[in-house]
Amino acid sequence: MIAPLLCILSYNFNTFAILNVYSKLTMFCTTNSLPMDLLLKQGSLKQEVESFCYQIVSESNDQKVGILQSEDKQLQPSVSKKSEGELSRVKFISNSNKITFSKKPKRRKYDESYLSFGFTYFGNRDAPHAQCVLCKKILSNSSLAPSKLRRHLETKHAAYKDKDISFFKQHLDSPENNKPPTPKIVNTDNESATEASYNVSYHIALSGEAHTIGELLIKPCAKDVVMRMFDEQYSKKIDAVQLSNSTVARRIKDLAADIEEELVCRLKICDGFSLQLDESADVSGLAVLLVFVRYRFNKSIEEDLLLCESLQSNATGEEIFNCINSFMQKHEIEWEKCVDVCSDASRAVDGKIAEAVTLIKYVAPESTSSHCLLYRHALAVKIMPTSLKNVLDQAVQIINYIKARPHQSRLLKILCEEMGAQHTALLLNTEVRWLSRGKVLVRLFELRRELLVFMDSAFRLSDCLTNSSWLLRLAYLADIFTKLNEVNLSMQGKNVTVFTVFDKMSSLLRKLEFWASSVEEENFDCFPTLSDFLTEINSTVDKDICSAIVQHLRGLRATLLKYFPVTNDNNAWVRNPFTVTVKPASLVARDYESLIDLTSDSQVKQNFSELSLNDFWSSLIQEYPSIARRAVRVLLPFATMHLCETGFSYYAATKTKYRKRLDAAPHMRIRLSNITPNIKRICDKKTQKHCSH
């Protein structure tokens, strides 16, 4: 009986374990005066001997041996957790006194010849995994067989099945293949799905699209992309992202609330802020109030949407003020920090906006009010001599005659295409100041030949297109309005200061004087359209036309001076502190001393040439707090109503006649704000995160 036992042990264990088992088992039999054969037979001591043997073997390299099975009951030896993984090697057979051992799982070795099938090894050299050098797919150790590797090559990479080993070796040695493989890990838990839902909703709000686009377009497209580039199983994970209509609406409200919370925190800690407000009506007839705020944050001056509210009752000045005041009190924002209110209502206008501004100045006594400088510019350019005004009105009538009749517009397009014209349609004229009237008149002048052929002789203004004097005046108007619109556009945009606008106006005033002097000398090089037309017809400008042009230019300059008067600017030190040699009247002695220290700093001087005016003074708050805060207070007021005008354009594009019931305020908060929502923070506040079903 001992010989078979030793034979079994020698098959499964090392020599040290065999000797250890045999010696201790012999000692056990001698101590108890029992023959060993008796222990190995069925009997009362059998279980004790088996436990003893298991203990001995467990102490020897954590190996296990099973001894004898009872005909009546199968034994379950107790072993340590460390060795449970190898217990499968021992098989107990009932109705037999024999013991059997299953073989160890076979560990295949990697052979260099496997590279001919496009496979290298990955992981432990003693128990490697097979890795395809083409697709980087990792196979188990059991796949390290030529037949399985060849099958992968022929099914997955049939185009390379006839390549020799040198091809795969070159592919293996490339830099891309030397990078460690990155496992494909797709996190499909509810938290990740929720964050993805917020990200998609954020982009939907930024684009102004309908909420249904998430479920109807974005999710199917995302699934198609993932399925084509990765695998179908990963594509199915996208179904967990919640993008239904109602879910996207809730997500957008959460994002807007987070942005509002961040904005309120910034306003509470800032030194001061200015407001810009305007009111308009939406597609459903509601009065919509937009209020923007300008404030210093960190080392820059920021502009954000303060509120977008629908006025349910009468849109009076008191109602507008109550709406703003309610927001300020709700969030505990101090009115004392308000330094200026910009609107489209001048002091001479007695309207609801003007009334609201007056009420704001009552609760914020130190604040000032300003009139949009673009409005001043628009009012100034409307004044012109009668002869030029008549030409402008007639040009608008010709354009409207074509644009108001779709059939006429189609016929004109066909005619322009046949005549090889650069353009095929006229531009519709509008009185809105930020659209270019210059482009409208230039287009009309460029299509004058096509219009002459197209116009019916019965139309009373058709003779204007053959009148050279009329065309000369039209050419001049096209040029001057193009120049004025360029100035108008240069004053629009974010972070435009009062200094920027007055610099543009100063430049325009000097140009107007120069243009008037040039026309008096019959030099029309400043007006390219007029100059080219004179060359084309080989003619000169009549005295009365020259007189009208000079009168218009000089009158325009005088009107601009009325709306933009040249005054002694006590805040010139803000524009360029390094040119100040005398104490400005607006500064006290201590502030002027701080200004001297500032201008004597070489590093500050270098920063002045590299940074914008807003960023320059904002960056000096820590080092020169007193003088820097005074400068920032001068820079805070809005110069134009550009943000409100842009905001209403976005509002009209978001809340269309097909979405009249939409609450557009959260969309405007996201679309018109420079603050990016903290999606991680929003998700952390959610106690439950559900995936899509």
Swiss-Prot record:
User: Where would I find the BED-type zinc fingers in this protein?
Assistant: 108-164
User: Which terms are listed as keywords in the entry?
Assistant: Metal-binding, Zinc, Zinc-finger
Binding positions for Zn(2+)? 132, 135, 152, 157
Please give the Pfam families that the UniProt record associates with this protein.
zf-BED (PF02892)
Q: Which residues form a coiled coil?
A: none
Q: Which GO terms describe its molecular function?
A: DNA binding; zinc ion binding
Q: Would the keyword Zinc be found if you checked this record's keyword annotation?
A: yes
Q: What else is known?
A: May be derived from an ancient transposon that has lost its ability to translocate.
Name-wise, this protein is Zinc finger BED domain-containing protein 5
User: What is the organism field in this record?
Assistant: Homo sapiens
Species classification: Eukaryota, Metazoa, Chordata, Craniata, Vertebrata
